[in-house]
Each structure stands twice: as structure tokens, then as C-alpha cells.
Amino acid sequence: MPLNVSFANRNYDLDYDSVQPYFYCDEEENFYQQQQQSELQPPAPSEDIWKKFELLPTPPLSPSRRSGLCSPSYVAFASFSPRGDDDGGGGSFSTADQLEMVTELLGGDMVNQSFICDPDDETFIKNIIIQDCMWSGFSAAAKLVSEKLASYQAARKDSGSPSPARGPGGCPTSSLYLQDLTAAASECIDPSVVFPYPLNDSSSPKPCASPDSAAFSPSSDSLLSSAESSPRASPEPLALHEETPPTTSSDSEEEQEEEEEIDVVSVEKRQPPAKRSESGSPSAGGHSKPPHSPLVLKRCHVPTHQHNYAAPPSTRKDYPAAKRAKLDSGRVLKQISNNRKCISPRSSDTEENDKRRTHNVLERQRRNELKRSFFALRDQIPELENNEKAPKVVILKKATAYILSVQAGEQKLISEKDLLRKRREQLKHKLEQLRNSCA
């Protein structure tokens, strides 16, 4: 970077001739026209190259409720034109007005347009800082805001005497805020379309005392106390007071989200006080809200076989004493069942161990009996009678051969027996013949 600075401090014609091959040959695009006219030091070549790589402006946000204040016409009117006769003249701005204008300048399209370099702008001529892709946009935005604030202060000084002291209800900027709100009401979405349920009953102004309001006073007090004790802040009223400055679109969206979430909590916490009011005052039962009671039941009903993931973490304080006792008894029963479940696995483990032990004993007995039978078979075979280390396969083979040989000897002996029987029969018959001949 120091090389570029020293390089730019030399003669401009020689420098441009030396770095001319680095630029595009385009006659329509002249980077240094403004510098040549004003006879200022030219920027480094990298400065204009980074212009081609600047990021596009961010997408626009939701339409602000004060769209009139964001427009350049309103800014010019508010800063340079005098107010009406009722305001006391002068374009003076309070601290809230300046902060609001700064926030809208930072979030609006004027700053986004400032990121794109305009060669006819004064800031392009005076900008001698070597730009960087990270810091050039922020410096331009800060410079634009400071220039706008300086113009506002100059307009305030030139406008004349400051406006007289304003009371809490006579702020002209607040009247302009309300006028802008009414003018931009067509651009905004009706909250009743997004939130069909009543958002905040406690924020509405309380009417005169009536029997209906007296009947529901405990529930409203309990709602207020629960809203104050809740970790989240209570929802702000929708009606803007005169001294409250209008919020931006992002703030309004966050307030709507908080109001929606707190509305769900208030519907859940509204059920026990309503029951108490119905049981305590039977006369007010006819004036109870019929459309809201089924809604509360539908939103608070949770099936027993499902887990309510959207429920608050601790719901024990919402239940009465009877339900607490039932919950405690149910927890005790669950603990007992869990203990039984814990005991039953132990008993099943012992049973499995006993079965395994008896199986091992029976298997050992079977192996011992099989070994004894093999030893007995080995003793019956003449070839393996004295061989104590004979394997079982050899014992089985030798036993099979010995049995076959024994069966063959048996058949031979049976045939010899038959021959001897026949011989005996023949000899007996011959002896009988000799006895008969001698007689």
C-alpha cells in the first residue's frame, strides 16, 4: 500500500502512461474525469477496481409505519421548509427526532444507494482514502450520516428562534408522527387479520365500574400479576401516545411477536381465575364470555398419551390443591411402578442365571455319561482294550468293524448248528430202522 501512495504522488501523465495497460479500453467510461477538473490527486488504480466488486444493496425491509419520514421529500420539507404557524416556525428537531432520522437513514434506501459510487457526487471527489472491500462501505455510510446531521443542524440554526416550550400533549413532531401513521395505515397490515384472538385485554383503557367488570376484576388482576411476574416483558399497548416516538419496521415486528407469545401464556393462565370467579359469584355466570371459554379449553387441552412440547416448563403453580395432590399421588405411583420395574429385571436376571446354571450341570452330566459309554465300548474291542488314549473316532470305527465280524461269526455258527441238527435227525431215523429189523 505505501508503494501505491508514493506512486500516486509523482507526475500524473507519466503515471497514467505506465499503468495504462491495467485499465479497460472503454472510451465511454472515464474514471478520472472529476479529478482532472478539480486538479486533485488521483486515487490508486485498485480503488476503482474495487468499485466493480462492491456488494449490491441489501433487500428492502418491510414497509415502515412512518413511510413519510423516510422519503427524501419529507426530509427536505422537515429540514429546510418552515413549519406551520401553529408550530411556532422553524425546522427544529428534538433528540428523538434526530435519533429517528439516523436510524431511518441507516436502514433506508438512501444509505444503500450511497454504496454505489456516483461520479457526479461530491463525496466521490473528496474521497482520497484508499478503499477496501471491508471498510469502504462503512466509512461512506458514516460520512453520509454526518453530512446529513450537519445539514439538519445548519437548517435548525438558519430557521430562526427555537419553538416555544411544548407541554406533554402538544408536541408537533408527535402530531406529525400520528399524521404519518394515519397516512401509512393503508400500507400496513391490520393486526386483527394476523391475530384473530384478543391481543392484550389489560392494555385497553378501563371503563367505568360495572357489575361485569367487577365480576372479572380478580381475573384481570391475576392476569396483570402473572404478566408482571413472567420473565418476558408485558406487551406494550397498540395505541401510540403523543410523546412516544414511532418505531421502525423491525421493532414493530418484534413487538408483534412478543404480543403473540405472551397472548398464548395469558390464555393458559386465564383458566383458573375464571373458574374461581364462576364458582365465587353465581350471578356473574350469565355474563361470562361464552366464545372464549371453549377456545381456552381447546388451547389448554393436552391428551394424556402425548407430551405437550409447547407447554411452559413449570405448570405446577397453575393447578389448585386437589390437582396438586392428584399429581403427587400419580408421581408416587409412577415411582412405585418404576421400582417394580427395577426389581423385576433383577428377578429375571436371577432366573436366567439359575437356568444357565442348571443347563450347565445337565450338560456336564451328559458329557460324563458319553465319555463313560465310549470307555465301555473301547473295553469291548480287543484291539483297543489296552489303549486308554484312543480317540472317539477310532473307537467308533473299530467298534463297527468288530460288530460286523461278530455278526459274520454268528451266521457261520448258526449254519453249522443247522447242519448238526439235520445230521442228528438222520442218525435217529437210521437207529429206528435197525431196531425194527432186529425185532
Swiss-Prot record:
User: Which is one GO molecular function term here?
Assistant: DNA-binding transcription factor activity, RNA polymerase II-specific
Biased composition (Acidic residues) is annotated at 251-263
Q: Which InterPro entries match?
A: bHLH_dom, HLH_DNA-bd_sf, Myc-LZ, Myc_transcription_factors, Tscrpt_reg_Myc, Tscrpt_reg_Myc_N
User: Which positions, given as ranges, span the membrane?
Assistant: none
Please list where the region (Disordered) is annotated: 201-296
Q: Which residues carry this modification: Phosphoserine?
A: 6, 62, 71, 81, 151, 159, 161, 293, 314, 329, 344, 347-348
Q: Which UniProt keywords apply?
A: Acetylation, Activator, Chromosome, Cytoplasm, DNA-binding, Glycoprotein, Isopeptide bond, Nucleus, Phosphoprotein, Proto-oncogene, Transcription, Transcription regulation, Ubl conjugation
Coordinates of motif 9aaTAD in the sequence? 100-108
Q: Where Phosphothreonine occurs, residue numbers?
A: 58, 315
Q: Which residues form the bHLH domain?
A: 354-406
Which compartment or compartments is the protein found in?
A: Nucleus, Nucleoplasm; Nucleus, Nucleolus; Nucleus; Cytoplasm
Residue positions the entry lists as glycosylated:
58
**Annotated region (Leucine-zipper), positions in chain:** 413-434
Does the record carry Phosphoprotein as a key word? Answer: yes
Instruction: List, alphabetically, the Pfam families matched.
Output: HLH (PF00010), Myc-LZ (PF02344), Myc_N (PF01056)
Q: What CDD domains does this protein map onto? A: bHLHzip_c-Myc
- Give me the stretches of Low complexity compositional bias: 207-238
Post-translational events: Phosphorylated by PRKDC. Phosphorylation at Ser-329 by PIM2 leads to the stabilization of MYC. Phosphorylation at Ser-62 by CDK2 prevents Ras-induced senescence. Phosphorylated at Ser-62 by DYRK2; this primes the protein for subsequent phosphorylation by GSK3B at Thr-58. Phosphorylation at Thr-58 and Ser-62 by GSK3 is required for ubiquitination and degradation by the proteasome. Dephosphorylation at multiple sites by the PNUTS-PP1 complex promotes MYC stability by preventing ubiquitination by the SCF(FBXW7) complex. Ubiquitinated by the SCF(FBXW7) complex when phosphorylated at Thr-58 and Ser-62, leading to its degradation by the proteasome. Ubiquitination is counteracted by USP28 in the nucleoplasm and USP36 in the nucleolus, both interacting with of FBXW7, leading to its deubiquitination and preventing degradation. Also polyubiquitinated by the DCX(TRPC4AP) complex. Ubiquitinated by UBR5 when not forming a heterodimer with another bHLH protein, leading to its degradation: UBR5 recognizes and binds a degron that is only available upon heterodimer dissociation.
GO BP terms, alphabetized:
chromatin remodeling; chromosome organization; DNA damage response; G1/S transition of mitotic cell cycle; intracellular iron ion homeostasis; MAPK cascade; negative regulation of apoptotic process; negative regulation of cell division
One CC-aspect GO term: cytoplasm
Q: What does this protein do, in the record's words?
A: Transcription factor that binds DNA in a non-specific manner, yet also specifically recognizes the core sequence 5'-CAC[GA]TG-3'. Activates the transcription of growth-related genes. Binds to the VEGFA promoter, promoting VEGFA production and subsequent sprouting angiogenesis. Regulator of somatic reprogramming, controls self-renewal of embryonic stem cells. Functions with TAF6L to activate target gene expression through RNA polymerase II pause release.
Q: Which PANTHER family match?
A: MYC PROTO-ONCOGENE
Official protein name in the record: Myc proto-oncogene protein
Instruction: Kindly list the organism's lineage.
Output: Eukaryota, Metazoa, Chordata, Craniata, Vertebrata
UniProt gene name? MYC
